[in-house]
UniProtKB/Swiss-Prot annotation:
InterPro entries assigned: Ribosomal_uL13 (IPR005822), Ribosomal_uL13_bac-type (IPR005823), Ribosomal_uL13_CS (IPR023563), Ribosomal_uL13_sf (IPR036899)
Disulfide bonds: none
Superkingdom of the organism of origin: Bacteria
Species, as recorded: Synechococcus sp. (strain CC9605)
Region (Disordered): 129-150
Keyword Ribonucleoprotein: yes
Family stated for the protein in its record: Belongs to the universal ribosomal protein uL13 family.
Name of the molecule in the record: Large ribosomal subunit protein uL13
Name of a matching Pfam family: Ribosomal_L13
Function according to Swiss-Prot or TrEMBL: This protein is one of the early assembly proteins of the 50S ribosomal subunit, although it is not seen to bind rRNA by itself. It is important during the early stages of 50S assembly.
Length: 150
């Protein structure tokens, strides 16, 4: 029986990508970014190793959702104290902390364990077009080409 060769974790060459979220649909952007973070786009993908790349998402405040979701989609969080449940709509959260919307959507598509937390640390989300990762020379990652044509 042949053994499957695994890439040594220190030999994985991680790329940096930048994604412009302007006029992108939240879920469609999140699925593609989650696949890159997970490493599914790499030929050396292994489910139990973190082989993913770094992703920088800019223009988080310009993300789109369809239908009545801006008024009806709710984001819940709890402080851990009695009566500490906070509920906020997509619109309100987008105005206050637009980065959290993108982070929460992508985090829900990663594994829910220590490996998923490690993958999530490679995601950087920013409001506006500026980001502090220019030294890493991130390459633009083209997502959903049909949405940019509209």
């Amino acid at each position: 029986m042949n053994k499957t060769s695994l890439p040594p974790i220190d030999s994985i060459d991680r790329q940096w990508y930048v994604v412009d979220a302007e006029n992108q649909t939240l879920g469609r952007l999140a699925t593609e970014v989650a696949a890159v973070l997970r490493g599914k786009t790499n030929p050396s993908f292994t489910p139990h190793l973190d082989t993913g790349d770094f992703v920088v998402v800019v223009n988080a405040e310009k993300i789109k959702v369809s239908g009545r979701k801006p008024q009806q989609k709710l984001y819940r969080r709890h402080s851990g104290r009695p009566g500490g449940m906070k509920v906020e709509t997509f619109e309100a959260l987008q105005e206050r902390i637009p980065e959290r919307i993108v982070e929460k959507a992508i985090k829900g598509m990663l594994p829910h364990n220590a490996l998923g937390r490690q993958m999530f640390r490679k995601l950087k989300v920013y409001k506006g077009t500026e980001h502090p990762h220019a030294a890493q020379k991130p390459q633009p990652l083209q997502l959903n080409p049909s949405a940019s044509a509209q």
